[in-house]
Curated annotation (Swiss-Prot):
Gene designation per UniProt: ACO
Protein name as annotated: 1-aminocyclopropane-1-carboxylate oxidase
GO terms (BP aspect): ethylene biosynthetic process; fruit ripening
Organism: Pisum sativum (Garden pea)
Lineage, opening ranks: Eukaryota, Viridiplantae, Streptophyta, Embryophyta, Tracheophyta
Reaction catalysis annotation: 1-aminocyclopropane-1-carboxylate + L-ascorbate + O2 = ethene + L-dehydroascorbate + hydrogen cyanide + CO2 + 2 H2O
Gene3D superfamilies named among the record's database cross-references: B-lactam Antibiotic, Isopenicillin N Synthase, Chain (2.60.120.330)
């Protein structure tokens, strides 16, 4: 089995830049995932985020989760559950307008560090998008511009905890899916594993690594790259012991951003369009009902809708 791709961002400013860019290229083409180290986010900040996230779960969310489990009788299930996930979550919106001040039960210190963490992740996301542009032969800033709607991109963070599960063979932590959006940056627990991706019809563990950021590509990057890069099915396996923390930040197109394959990435003599052109919010509305199904029917449905939907040009910045 090939080794999971680990990208040392610090090597981009050394004589190893070419090989590092090749590693990113291979990861995007063949994995849809890679893990970043030396990414510019301080160890101290990451440790604080982890500490306060776990404290918040214990203080404000653990009991609610236990009550939900008891209400639904999940500890006694005898057959596979396919309509819910074994996770406790809340969501923070950063762009276009932050919702952090509106989320109840967050301590002031937690709000402050999550705002700072989000700014660092936004910078990293935009740096990575430009690296992808370089590998794809697109002008610098192309992907960021493609994600811009009238109010800029959407950016938010899903904070998840996966408590110990008594029946992991019957209940998934998070069911298999591809991500709808652009580029996803994950700060995951380094002690409790669970995240897996599908590669060559086999489920492969995404290795927990302290202070790393896991990157994966969403459906929108598959469309814009005309399939050169792929979004990949992934899931979270619940564990019988140990609670797993997951902080996933989604740098997505704006609601009214128009998404379509980059013209320079269309193949010569390509007689039929493989990927549709659509407004991102229209895709999200479709995705919400089909998240845990294959992505191809979503693309096909958007393709069929193309003739009846008028979309304008990409917003310039």
């Amino acid at each position: 089995m090939e080794n999971f791709p680990i990208v040392d961002m610090g090597k981009l400013n050394t004589e190893d830049r070419k090989s590092t860019m090749e590693l990113i290229k291979d990861a995007c083409e063949n994995w849809g995932f890679f893990e970043c180290v030396n990414h510019g986010i301080s160890i101290e900040m990451m440790d604080t985020v982890e500490k306060l996230t776990k404290e918040h779960y214990k203080k404000c969310m653990e009991q609610r989760f236990k009550e939900m489990v008891a209400t639904k009788g999940l500890e006694c299930v005898q057959s596979e559950i396919d309509d819910l996930d074994w996770e406790s979550t809340f969501f923070l919106r950063h762009l276009p307008v932050s919702s952090i001040s509106e989320i109840p039960d967050l301590d002031d210190d937690y709000r402050k560090v999550m705002k700072e963490f989000a700014l660092k992740l936004e910078e990293l996301a935009e740096e990575l998008l430009d690296l992808l542009c370089e590998n794809l032969g697109l002008e610098k800033g192309y992907l960021k511009k493609a994600f811009y709607g009238s109010k800029g991109p959407n950016f938010g963070t899903k904070v998840s905890n996966y408590p110990p599960c008594p029946k992991p063979e019957l209940i998934k932590g998070l069911r298999a899916h591809t991500d709808a959006g652009g580029i996803i940056l994950l700060f995951q627990d380094d002690k409790v594993s669970g995240l897996q991706l599908l590669k060559d019809d086999q489920w492969i563990d995404v290795p927990p690594m302290r202070h790393s950021i896991v990157i994966n590509l969403g459906d929108q990057l598959e469309v814009i790259t005309n399939g050169k890069y792929k979004s990949v099915m992934h899931r979270v396996i619940a564990q019988t012991d140990g609670a797993r923390m997951s902080i996933a930040s989604f740098y997505n197109p704006g609601d009214d951003a128009v998404i379509s394959p980059a013209s320079t990435l269309l193949k010569e003599n390509e007689t039929s369009e493989v990927y549709p052109k659509f407004v991102f919010d229209d895709y999200m509305k479709l995705y919400m009902g089909l998240k845990f199904q294959a992505k191809e029917p979503r693309f096909e449905a958007m393709m069929k809708a193309m003739s009846s939907v008028k979309v304008g040009p990409v917003v310039s910045i």
